């Protein structure tokens, strides 16, 4: 699916190009480049590289109102080339400070950016 092949960008121009053979929609490429880490130690930086962000399965918890993203090694392989860190094959609570609320989600599916063993950015399916 084309949307699953489109990935987000994080910090360095060296990571701004997609892996070989992955088609890029120019409009979506610009959208991903516009996403910034909303808060925390990486605030203001680009959310992700093409290797770090994916559409993910998400659930909400009625008790705490938080999002949980399923982070698995099939979606985020740790082959050493992108610095994903270990994918726990588990539901991971999305920290409130990494949720992007200021723009719509053009993919229509939840996006999580998993980098160095943590979620750096998250865009809900509905966006704002």
Task: Briefly describe each language-model feature range.
Residues 11-13:
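N-terminal signal peptide c-region/cleavage motif recognized by signal peptidases
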Residues 69-106:
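Short Fe-S-cluster ligation motifs
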Residues 65-74, 121-124:
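Generic recognition of long tandem-repeat/solenoid scaffolds
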Residues 17-70:
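N-terminal secretory signal peptides
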Residues 93-95, 101-128:
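C-terminal partner/receptor-binding element of secreted or periplasmic proteins
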Residues 1-7:
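Sec-dependent signal peptide recognition
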